[in-house]
């Protein structure tokens, strides 16, 4: 079983995935790290300081791991595009995402792009199949993990519970060159 933990950068995917790994003993594949380490990309986008993923190579890489593991967690903001059986979409207040990404040293253009993606529900809208959406804003990690475990156990589906558009609409009209 492939479980995708997806969401805009800065929502808490890696933190949540690590706790799930520790509590459930499930193999976690950090998509970003795997793409870099195993050169599963076609090029590096210097402007956005990111890699253009070769999805064919990445899919093959995941398939090989999945042959050995009964269940895997795919941790990454594109994990919902990798044929998961179940998708957890983590959401977070755009202001918190902004702070986290700036702390990580993201360029202003990349910060804005990610804030806009969160406001517009990009990861949620791209997610097809069984989807469970969770707002992580100001929540305890253990509480979030408990909710995820319960959702997976009962194959719960929930989406459309978070809407940042009205409160953060002004971010959608900004542009950084």
UniProtKB/Swiss-Prot annotation:
What Pfam family is a match, any one?
AAA_18
Residue ranges, annotated region (NMP): 30-53
Which parts pass through the membrane? none
What sort of enzyme, by top EC class, is this?
transferase
> Which of this chain's residues are annotated to bind ATP?
10, 12-15, 104
Known EC number: 2.7.4.3
Coiled-coil intervals, chain numbering:
none
Q: Which reaction does it catalyse?
A: AMP + ATP = 2 ADP; ATP + H2O = ADP + phosphate + H(+)
Q: Which UniProt keywords apply?
A: ATP-binding, Kinase, Nucleotide-binding, Ribosome biogenesis, rRNA processing, Transferase
Region spans: LID: 103-113
Mind telling me which InterPro entries this protein's record contains? Adenyl_kinase_AK6, P-loop_NTPase
- Gene Ontology terms for molecular function: adenylate kinase activity; ATP binding; ATP hydrolysis activity
Assembly and oligomerization? Interacts with uS11. Not a structural component of 40S pre-ribosomes, but transiently interacts with them by binding to uS11.
Function, as annotated, reads: Broad-specificity nucleoside monophosphate (NMP) kinase that catalyzes the reversible transfer of the terminal phosphate group between nucleoside triphosphates and monophosphates. Also has ATPase activity. Involved in the late maturation steps of the 30S ribosomal particles, specifically 16S rRNA maturation. While NMP activity is not required for ribosome maturation, ATPase activity is. Associates transiently with small ribosomal subunit protein uS11. ATP hydrolysis breaks the interaction with uS11.
Which NCBIfam families does the annotation name? PRK03839.1 (NF003012)
Q: Which family does it belong to?
A: Belongs to the adenylate kinase family. AK6 subfamily.
Would you tell me the protein name for this molecule? Putative adenylate kinase
């Amino acid at each position: 079983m492939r479980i995708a933990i997806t969401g805009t950068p800065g929502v808490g995917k890696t933190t949540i995935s690590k706790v799930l790994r520790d509590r459930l003993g499930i193999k976690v594949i950090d998509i970003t790290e795997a793409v870099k380490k195993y050169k599963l990309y076609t090029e590096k986008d210097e402007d956005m300081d990111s890699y253009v993923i070769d999805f064919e190579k990445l899919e093959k890489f995941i398939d090989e791991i999945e042959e050995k593991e009964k269940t895997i967690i795919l941790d990454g903001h594109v994990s919902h595009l990798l044929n998961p059986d179940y998708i957890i979409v983590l959401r977070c207040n755009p202001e918190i995402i902004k702070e986290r990404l700036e702390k990580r040293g993201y360029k202003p253009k990349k910060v804005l792009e990610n804030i806009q993606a969160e406001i517009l529900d990009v990861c949620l809208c791209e997610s097809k199949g069984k989807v469970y959406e969770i707002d992580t804003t100001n929540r305890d990690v253990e509480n979030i993990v408990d909710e995820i475990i319960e959702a997976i156990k009962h194959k719960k589906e929930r989406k459309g519970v978070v809407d940042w558009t009205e409160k953060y609409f002004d971010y959608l009209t900004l542009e950084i060159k």
